Amino acid sequence: MKMLGEPEFKENILYYSFLNELFLILIRNGFSCSHAKLILDETRKRGLECSGQFEVISNSVEAPEPESLERIAKTLFTPRPHWGRLVAFLAYLAYLQKNSTEKLFWNDHLKKLKQIVKCHIVPWTLGPRDPKPKQRPFDKLPSAFYFLTAAASCLTLLLLYFRTTQTK
């Protein structure tokens, strides 16, 4: 299995260890290794692509406290989360750690991230997408098919009957 860090990031051990912690949080909450790896690969890509936007945000606010992580997550993932918001949230946190020379996210932050994933993301990924599943278009096919077949048979019998009576 390929290691999580890209070669240019291996110099930044704090960034690499933060990504590893995120990877473990996702796996411990029921994500498969391949899905967790895809999420973190996308997180790294988006972190690089959006670094200019993240720089503007990080200049205007300080690194989030554990309680503010919960508030941010509630606003991002309510009423319903989606993958783009999850990746953007993780990419911003990874960007903050990558550009910092000290550890930003301590055990309190990681516990809060575990709680966020468990409360907001896991129910969304494991639960049904729609509480009332849509009916497939061919669920009622047998009854409609039988009705149309019977109607066509009756019509055929009537046509045959009238044709035979007209020829007599």
Swiss-Prot record:
GO biological process assignments: regulation of apoptotic process; symbiont-mediated suppression of host apoptosis
Any one annotated GO CC term: membrane
Intracellular or extracellular location(s): Host membrane
Keyword Coiled coil carried by entry: no
InterPro entries hit by this protein: Bcl-2-like_sf
Bilayer-crossing regions: 143-162
Keyword Chloroplast: no
Keywords from the named record: Host membrane, Host-virus interaction, Inhibition of host apoptosis by viral BCL2-like protein, Membrane, Modulation of host cell apoptosis by virus, Transmembrane, Transmembrane helix
Membrane topology annotation: Single-pass membrane protein
The protein's role, per its UniProt record: Suppresses apoptosis in host cell and thus facilitates production of progeny virions.
Name of the molecule in the record: Putative apoptosis regulator A9
Organism classification: Viruses, Duplodnaviria, Heunggongvirae, Peploviricota, Herviviricetes
